[in-house]
Amino acid sequence: MNKNMAGILSAAAVLTMLAGCTAYDRTKDQFVQPVVKDVKKGMSRAQVAQIAGKPSSEVSMIHARGTCQTYILGQRDGKAETYFVALDDTGHVINSGYQTCAEYDTDPQAAK
């Protein structure tokens, strides 16, 4: 019985440590990825381009006015890790984060 409990606790500890890896990797991005580290709300499109370079894609948003740029930060678990920068219709940063533009540009009225 005690061996079973020890096994369960060990498995839980390993899963907890693995879950923390994503948060740690993203924290590392705050120091090494210019698009994550230096791009701030209110910056112009030209400032973002100067800091982050050319995005891998840019699309017009459907549920907001403006455009959304996607940057590829690297690979994680065989998939591209993406970071978006959303710009309003005047070309200034309104938001950014670890999503694709499609994930970010969703209908706020849609049921979840």
Swiss-Prot record:
GO CC terms: outer membrane; plasma membrane
Signal sequence segment: 1-20
Annotated PROSITE patterns: PROKAR_LIPOPROTEIN (PS51257)
A Pfam family: BamE
Domain of life assignment: Bacteria
Parts forming coiled coils: none
Induction per the UniProt record: By elevated osmotic pressure in the growth medium.
Lipidation, N-palmitoyl cysteine type: 21
Location within or outside the cell: Cell inner membrane
Lipidation (S-diacylglycerol cysteine): 21
Main localization (coarse): membrane
Keywords: Cell inner membrane, Cell membrane, Lipoprotein, Membrane, Palmitate, Signal
InterPro entries on file: BamE-like, BamE_dom
Membrane topology type: Lipid-anchor
A Gene Ontology biological process term: response to osmotic stress
Protein name, entry field: Osmotically-inducible putative lipoprotein OsmE
